[in-house]
Design a protein with these regions (language model features):
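Phosphate-coordination/substrate-recognition cap region in phosphate-metabolizing enzymes
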Residues: 38-104
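C-terminal "cap" of GNAT-fold acetyltransferases
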Residues: 298-302, 310-334
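A short, internal acetyl-CoA/4′-phosphopantetheine-binding micro-motif in the GNAT/acyltransferase core
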Residues: 79, 264-271
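Conserved GNAT acetyl-CoA-binding A-motif
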Residues: 287-299
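Conserved acetyl-CoA pyrophosphate-binding loop and the N-cap/start of the following alpha-helix
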Residues: 32, 270, 274-282
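Loop-to-helix element that buttresses phosphate recognition and phosphoryl-transfer chemistry
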Residues: 9-62, 116-130
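Conserved beta-strand in the GNAT
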Residues: 239, 245-253, 260-265
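Acidic, low-complexity terminal tails and accessory targeting/binding regions
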Residues: 2-3, 87-95, 160-229, 325-334
Length: 334
């Protein structure tokens, strides 16, 4: 009796967009991620599903694209969580490269060697995700199931099921957000039918089409790191650096329920290269650590479209971004 398990990587989340390390940090889906979910829902429209599982992190709960149309309950399974990143959690990838370039490379290229304080090893991730798949198969004999998980966890699991060592897995590719893989489970045998298929995503909606790190031989990318330049009475200014040179600043002020961005600067040479969104991500991170539920800013009319892409909405003369961890409606296609 064969059980089919569709593995789905979660939609684009804040860590993917802002280039921040989110392993088991509970981040949320971006507006672009919700657009990806609309295409994922369409891909599975004619597919019978008997159950939908996912890790217990918020960004996989948005598998609602699969279970809500079918009247199914979401089944959280912590065994499918992303790798725990220890002291790397919530650091920008630029900061991590600056701290330990070799360990950053090992994370992508030599997972067998990767060791970080407070983190899991990839061997531990391999073992628990395998346990999760076997549990799903045992609970759904002969059924067809979808299971939502995470990039590094899925890469490790799929490579293992294809007979690779951890060292060999470091030479395999990465799956885009909402990429789909298919397993067939019969007894103790688990076969990978296909993996990392994101053909349902148009280029304009793909996360990977806008990023280069996954194409690089060492999986590196130029990334900003941040340092506090000034802080006083609820106001804070951070500098954004590449290597040791300052290329931008962001100034913020705490209000009772929100964080106000009072200044947002990036040198012209870096504009249009996805560095500006890393500045915005730093503000989101800081707002969350301070318990604020919104970002507020004022900007010229010609920049409102830019901020609207990332979830800001106009409110009078200002724009507001809602930071609450809530499940939003998946848009319709067309």
């Amino acid at each position: 009796m064969t059980t089919k398990i569709f593995l789905v990587r979660h939609a684009e989340a804040e860590g993917n967009l802002f280039r921040v390390a989110h392993g088991q940090y509970d981040s949320v889906i971006t507006p672009q991620g919700y657009r990806q979910l609309a295409y994922l829902r369409e891909r599975f429209r004619e597919e019978r599903l008997d159950a939908v599982y996912g890790s217990d992190l918020t960004r996989t709960h948005i598998a609602s694209a699969l279970y809500v149309p079918r009247g199914l309950e979401f089944r959280p399974l912590p065994l499918l969580r992303e790798i725990r990143l220890g002291v790397w959690e919530q650091l920008s990838w630029g900061q991590i490269q600056r701290m330990d370039k070799q360990m950053y490379v090992d994370f992508n290229k030599r997972p067998d060697l990767w060791r970080v304080e407070g983190a899991e090893t990839f061997a531990q991730v391999r073992d628990r995700t395998l346990e999760g798949i076997r549990q799903i198969a045992a609970e759904n004999p002969g059924g067809t199931v979808a299971a939502a998980s995470h990039g590094a966890a899925l890469r490790t699991l799929l490579g293992t099921l294809q007979g690779m060592s951890l060292e060999e897995i470091g030479q395999t590719g990465h799956g885009d957000n909402t990429a789909v893989s298919l397993l067939e489970v019969e007894g103790d045998n688990i076969r990978v039918v296909f993996r990392d298929d994101a053909s349902h995503l148009p280029a304009a909606v793909s996360t990977f089409r806008r990023q280069s790190w996954h194409k690089d031989d060492a999986a590196t990318e130029p990334g900003l790191w941040f340092r506090v330049a000034a802080e006083e009475d609820g106001s804070r200014t951070e500098e954004a650096l590449l290597e040791e040179e300052v290329f931008g600043t962001i100034s913020m002020a705490l209000e009772p329920e929100a964080l106000r961005i009072t200044d947002y600067q990036l040198v012209p040479a870096l504009r249009g290269q996805r560095y500006g969104i890393q500045l915005l991500g730093q503000a989101v991170q800081y707002a969350r650590t301070q318990g604020r539920e919104a970002l507020i800013l004022r900007c010229p009319e010609e920049l409102k479209g830019y901020f609207a892409k990332y979830g800001f909405v106009s409110s009078g003369a200002e724009m507001v971004m809602d930071l609450r961890r809530i499940v939003r409606e998946i848009p319709s296609l067309g």
